[in-house]
Swiss-Prot record:
NADP(+) binds at residues 10-11, 31-32, 38, 53, 75-79, 92, 144, 170, 178. InterPro entries: Epimerase_deHydtase, Heptose_epim, NAD(P)-bd_dom_sf. Substrate binds at residues 169, 180, 187, 201-204, 209, 272. NCBIfam families: heptose_epim (TIGR02197), PRK11150.1 (NF008360). The active site is at 140 (proton acceptor), 178 (proton acceptor). It comes from Salmonella arizonae (strain ATCC BAA-731 / CDC346-86 / RSK2980). GO terms for biological process: ADP-L-glycero-beta-D-manno-heptose biosynthetic process; carbohydrate metabolic process. This is ADP-L-glycero-D-manno-heptose-6-epimerase. Its EC number is 5.1.3.20. The keyword Disulfide bond does not apply. It is an enzyme of class 5 (isomerase). Catalyzes the interconversion between ADP-D-glycero-beta-D-manno-heptose and ADP-L-glycero-beta-D-manno-heptose via an epimerization at carbon 6 of the heptose. The keyword Isomerase applies.
Length: 310
């Protein structure tokens, strides 16, 4: 059995899909479906069982055996960069992750987990997986950074696989439940389909991010499980492309609309990553050599998925 925490969420459900595509269906999804809309991410997928996150954590902390576990993909976390409840964030992202990590270490179960480019904070260059480059801007980034630091202490003595992925700006299918935290491509598509002018912040041609397609993210996760390699790795494309490029690809697909530029909100000033670009040196040195989709390629594929029933 393979466990996917956050399996009804954005990246987790795409990992479930990638496993299904390889014929793997013996999957336990762990999630919190209090926000009931997330179930739609699983309706076209095949899993063996579902467990609520709280029940799962109780079993993990009690040391209860959950059966023959091949691997754990730990994608479950609070991923809101605008959540400022530090206790909630540390309990949810740090303590929970530590409990699950030790459960896996004691049983030599491969543990693949979601870290984040938010660990780098407001850098404009050198997004490198090393302490001197890490300075998170928000409590979400700090919770991810602290767990990475914890993993670094354990890695030299670990007898089983531990691998963390610093996700950059992931976009693609199955993110609709994220609301305001969904990608720009998702929001632009919604605005166009509602007959509105798609909106970007003023200066969006200067805001550049490493936008990585979620299908590529799932592929990297599965490749590492097969390779057995450990470490903490950036997971982006290695390219910085502008929000304007995302909009251009969206408009090109729809063949209509023009962008309305809106003022940059004061509340985001100083807390907003204006530039991200993954350094892929370590990922490539680990042996992962597949190409990553460009914004034009990924957004086009995503638009086709979003509008498949249109």
């Amino acid at each position: 059995m393979i466990i996917v925490t956050g399996g009804a969420g954005f990246i987790g459900s795409n990992i479930v899909k990638a496993l299904n595509d390889k014929g793997i269906t013996d999957i336990l999804v762990v999630d919190n479906l209090k926000e009931g809309t997330k179930f739609v991410n699983l309706v076209d997928l095949n899993i063996a069982d579902y467990m609520d996150k709280e029940d799962f954590l109780i079993q993990i902390m009690s040391g209860e055996e959950l059966g023959d576990i091949e691997a754990v993909f730990h994608e479950g976390a609070c991923s809101s960069t605008t959540e400022w409840d530090g206790k909630y964030m540390m309990d949810n992202n740090y303590q929970y992750s530590k409990e699950l990590l030790h459960y896996c270490l004691e049983r030599e179960i491969p543990f693949l987990y979601a870290s984040s480019a938010a660990t780098y904070g407001g850098r404009t260059s050198d997004f490198i997986e090393s302490r001197e480059y890490e300075k998170p801007l928000n409590v979400y980034g700090y919770s991810k950074f602290l767990f990475d630091e914890y993993v670094r202490q354990i890695l030299p003595e670990a007898n089983s696989q531990i691998v963390g992925f610093r996700y950059f700006n992931v976009y693609g299918p199955r993110e609709g439940h994220k609301g305001s935290m969904a990608s720009v491509a998702f929001h632009l598509n919604t605005q166009l389909n509602n007959g509105e002018s798609p909106k970007l912040f003023e200066g969006s041609e200067n805001f550049k991010r490493d936008f990585v397609y979620v299908g590529d993210v799932a592929d990297v996760n599965l490749w590492f499980l097969e390779s057995g390699k450990s470490g903490i790795f950036n997971l982006g494309t290695g390219r910085a492309e502008s929000f304007q490029a995302v909009a251009d690809a969206t408009l090109a697909y729809h063949k209509k609309g023009s962008i309305e530029y809106i003022p940059f909100p004061d509340k985001l000033k100083g807390r907003y990553q204006a530039f991200t670009q993954a350094d892929l040196t370590n990922l490539r040195n680990a042996g992962y050599d597949k190409p990553f989709k460009t914004v034009a390629e990924g957004v086009t594929e995503y638009m086709a998925w979003l509008n498949r029933d249109a």
